[in-house]
């Protein structure tokens, strides 16, 4: 048994049993992948995969248990390497943060600047994606941590911590009839074409829920994953925008007005997500603490251990 065999099994599951893709990802041949997996099965004395001819179609019952152990073993192996690097050089290394456009564009810049000032030798990578993509990057070990409002708390192998809460706001062009109107209602907003986020992005579910509970039917004419795109089309007069309040900057968005709508939409909570059992370098904890000062390394590390 060797780690390469374990990686082949893990990657076969990740690639939906497509051995061609496994070979491409791990830079080897398909026949080599098949042989290594079969050698491991022979050594263990069980079939890990269900086969139809030469094709893998799923995991056997013992294969499911083996796969869970392999994931654990490979995570522990990576943790060992991280522990060694932690003591070899505590202030340098790599840190991958998976997050959404909204967080990367509006919530993280000051934190990232502070972090790079404190840890100039750490190579930081921001990988943007949908909340579901962020979760997969965490689970696959492609990201050290993820930051998102949606999805992360739906995965049992991801431990999440609340960072901060925020509300949506409505933005309209200057001179719009809604500007200056007091005690704005969702029924009044629904009288105009609406531009807002795609489903599963930036608290869209809270927007839909608010209109449903008010008995109002919004005319959503355009959706996007990016608040900058939403604001651009609002400025063009195509509708009014519903965006995260943090996305409105009166100094930059000079052609727009943000309306007082905090009372209309439920607060959303942005969370940081970490894979259960993962070992984090000290500087990763510092980044989390800079982003959410109420969190601390001892609390986070303790919950990561308890979750295993």
From Swiss-Prot:
Disulfide bonds: none annotated. One of its GO terms (biological process) is cysteine biosynthetic process. Residues 19-38 bind DNA. Disruption phenotype: Mutant grows well with sulfate, but is unable to utilize ethanesulfonate as a sulfur source. SUPFAM superfamilies: Periplasmic binding protein-like II, Winged helix' DNA-binding domain. Keywords: DNA-binding, Transcription, Transcription regulation. Residues 1-59 form the HTH lysR-type domain. One of its GO terms (molecular function) is DNA-binding transcription factor activity. Belongs to the LysR transcriptional regulatory family. NCBIfam families: PRK12684.1. Transcriptional regulator that is essential for the utilization of a number of organic sulfur sources of either environmental or human origin. Required for aliphatic sulfonate utilization. Binds to DNA at target promoter regions. Targets include the ssuDBC operon, the tauABC operon, three tauD-type genes and atsA. This is HTH-type transcriptional regulator SsuR.
């Amino acid at each position: 048994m060797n780690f390469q065999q374990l990686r082949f099994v893990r990657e076969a599951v990740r690639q939906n049993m497509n051995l061609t893709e496994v070979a491409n990802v791990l830079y080897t041949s398909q026949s080599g992948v098949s042989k290594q997996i079969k050698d491991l099965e022979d050594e263990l004395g069980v079939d890990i995969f269900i086969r139809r001819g030469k094709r893998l179609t799923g995991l056997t019952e013992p294969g499911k248990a083996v796969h869970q152990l392999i994931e654990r073993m490979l995570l522990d192996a990576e943790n060992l390497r991280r522990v060694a690097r932690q003591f070899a050089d505590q202030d340098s290394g790599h840190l991958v943060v998976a997050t959404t456009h909204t967080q990367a564009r509006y919530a993280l810049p000051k934190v990232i600047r502070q972090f790079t000032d404190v840890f100039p030798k750490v190579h930081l990578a921001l990988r943007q994606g949908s909340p579901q993509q962020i979760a997969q990057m965490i689970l696959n070990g492609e990201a050290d941590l993820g930051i998102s409002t949606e999805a992360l708390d739906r995965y049992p192998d991801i431990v999440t911590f609340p960072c901060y809460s925020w509300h949506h706001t409505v933005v309209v062009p200057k001179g719009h009839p809604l500007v200056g109107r007091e005690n704005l209602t969702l029924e009044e907003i629904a009288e105009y074409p609406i531009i807002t986020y795609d489903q599963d992005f930036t608290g869209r579910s809270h927007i839909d829920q608010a209109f449903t509970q008010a008995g109002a039917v919004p005319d959503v004419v355009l959706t996007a994953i990016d608040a900058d795109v939403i604001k651009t089309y609002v400025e063009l007069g195509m509708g009014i925008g519903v965006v995260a309040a943090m996305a409105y900057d009166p100094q930059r968005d000079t052609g727009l007005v943000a309306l007082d709508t905090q009372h209309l939409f439920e607060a959303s909570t942005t969370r940081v997500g970490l894979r259960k059992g993962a070992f984090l370098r000290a500087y990763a904890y510092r980044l989390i603490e800079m982003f959410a000062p109420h969190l601390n390394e001892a609390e986070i590390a303790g919950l990561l251990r308890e979750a295993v």
